[in-house]
Design a protein with these regions (language model features):
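Non-catalytic, surface beta->alpha helical segment in thiol-disulfide oxidoreductase systems
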Residues: 18-21, 117, 122-164
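Extracytoplasmic/secreted cell-surface and envelope-processing proteins
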Residues: 73, 104-106, 131-132
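Local sequence-structure signature of Cys/Sec-based thiol-disulfide redox active-site neighborhoods
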Residues: 53-88
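"Short basic amphipathic alpha-helical interaction patches in structured regions
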Residues: 75-84, 94-97, 109-110, 134-136
Length: 165
């Protein structure tokens, strides 16, 4: 007798619905995830000066690993989507994988990707990873946009792993 909608999984820690596996961005924009998704998306102002400075953002492949149960994912992923949209990246071309609390997806998309924290955004060119943003921007003064810009310049920032999860 579970209230978990079809296609979703129960978070063993909270009993709330969570997504697992590869999803489309629209799945985050519907109940029950839309309440946090929409708020964050609406509030975020994209730094268009920086996104416009990224040369040919379409030459890169983007993969987002997140947990719908994770506060950092709930904050950063709606922002990432807004940034991709500003850069003219079709979200259908962004691989979005939702993970459980052990950072695992049922089909194993995370294997070999060294996903320690969520969200993790991996940027690749010609099938080679050129940078990643892990959990949040790389420093107090960095933004998702500045980290993406640095990755595009070939100087990927070192991820800012926090001490606590």
């Amino acid at each position: 007798s579970s209230d978990i909608p079809e296609g979703m999984f129960e978070d063993p820690k909270t009993g709330k619905p969570m997504l697992l596996g590869t999803i489309g961005i629209e799945e985050l924009q519907q109940d029950p995830f839309d309440e946090w998704y929409q708020v964050e998306s609406d509030a975020y102002q994209v730094d268009t000066e920086l996104t416009n400075a990224i040369s040919d953002p379409g030459q890169y492949t983007y993969e987002v690993f997140l947990g719908t149960w994770c506060g950092d994912s709930r904050r950063e992923v709606p922002r990432m989507e807004k940034i991709f949209s500003e850069m003219g990246i079709d979200m259908a071309n962004v691989l979005i994988v939702t993970l459980d609390r052990d950072k695992v997806s049922p089909s194993g998309e995370q294997e070999g990707r060294d996903i320690r924290y969520v969200p993790t955004l991996i940027v690749s060119k010609d099938n080679q990873e050129i940078g990643r943003i892990v959990e949040s921007p790389s420093s107090e003064t960095a933004t998702l946009e500045s980290d993406l810009f640095e990755i595009s310049l070939g100087i990927p920032p070192v991820p800012n792993y926090s001490d606590i999860e």
